[in-house]
C-alpha cells in the first residue's frame, strides 16, 4: 500500500505519486501520471502507519507473527488525487505517459483484522492529500 508524507522524498523506488508531484510543482514542472490515471491506490498517511505499528506493539494480544494489512481499506484513483491537487494548484497541467510495465491497477488493504482489534485510521485519504498540497501552496513546513 502507498504510505505518503508531506516530507517524503521524491527519489527512490518507494516514492509515491504524491511525493513526485510535490517535487515537480516545487520545481515549476508538470507532474506526470503513468497510464490513464485510473489506477487505484490505498494511500495511508505516515502518521497512521506509525499509529498502527504502535497499536499492534502495545496490544495485549499475542499475534504470533501474523501479518496485517495496514491501510485505509479504501482507495483513490490517481486522477482523483490529481483533482485534489488542482484545488490548490489550478494552473498545474498534468502530463500522461505510457503505463509502467507490470503496474498494479488496484490496491486496497484488507483492514478487517486490525478493525476487529479496535484500530482504525485517523486521517482520511482526501484530508491527508489536501494537507500535503495546502502546506506546499502556503509554503508551510510539514
Model regions and ranges:
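Flexible, glycine-rich beta-alpha linker
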Residues: 1-15
